[in-house]
């Protein structure tokens, strides 16, 4: 059996197996256990009572986290005319049409979010095989295909997270950084949970939010007592 590292021993000594943690207690414990030199992300995994094999039970959407993600988000926008000027004014890092598509085909994909106005989809449609696998393909269901590109840019810059159930019916999202105050992480998670509950499929039966787990990039996963969350 492999020996535990010093960090693993510290985690094992602090984390109680089988315990459900109050949210703020969990957030504080993750910060205490963080000894990594870089600023870790704090992530949430939410197990939903859905059957993701059924198309009407796939849960997807977007939430603007009230306290942001702590990340500098780079945004590219496919649009033209007055909408292009509005997107730039809203803080977009790059705006264009065919020339932007050519840049992306050439490998310039240093963006976290790609947004498009409906009239630009003729151009964006050529990039499906490039943007799709990276999770960057604009989609009206999460607000990244919209005539109001300026608002979409502002939302992305403000810390909007996009989510979709994976093959196991789990939602994964980054909800901040390890140096966030626990209350700010809690507010972000509550905003996400509120939207997930609003999007509950009518065909979903039984318990909808089955399990909530909070973790950091290099830290343990802590199961959250849902009674400690107001959502």
UniProtKB/Swiss-Prot annotation:
Keywords, comma-separated and alphabetical: Repressor, Ribonucleoprotein, Ribosomal protein, RNA-binding, rRNA-binding, Translation regulation, tRNA-binding
Residues annotated as transmembrane: none
UniProt xrefs under PROSITE patterns: RIBOSOMAL_L1 (PS01199)
One of the record's GO molecular function terms: structural constituent of ribosome
Cellular compartments per GO CC: cytosolic large ribosomal subunit
GO biological process: regulation of translation; translation
Taxonomic superkingdom: Bacteria
HAMAP family: Ribosomal_uL1_B
Function (record text): Binds directly to 23S rRNA. The L1 stalk is quite mobile in the ribosome, and is involved in E site tRNA release. Protein L1 is also a translational repressor protein, it controls the translation of the L11 operon by binding to its mRNA.
Subunit field text: Part of the 50S ribosomal subunit.
Membership in a protein family: Belongs to the universal ribosomal protein uL1 family.
Name of the molecule in the record: Large ribosomal subunit protein uL1
Source species taxonomy: Bacteria, Pseudomonadati, Pseudomonadota, Gammaproteobacteria, Pseudomonadales
Gene coding for it: rplA
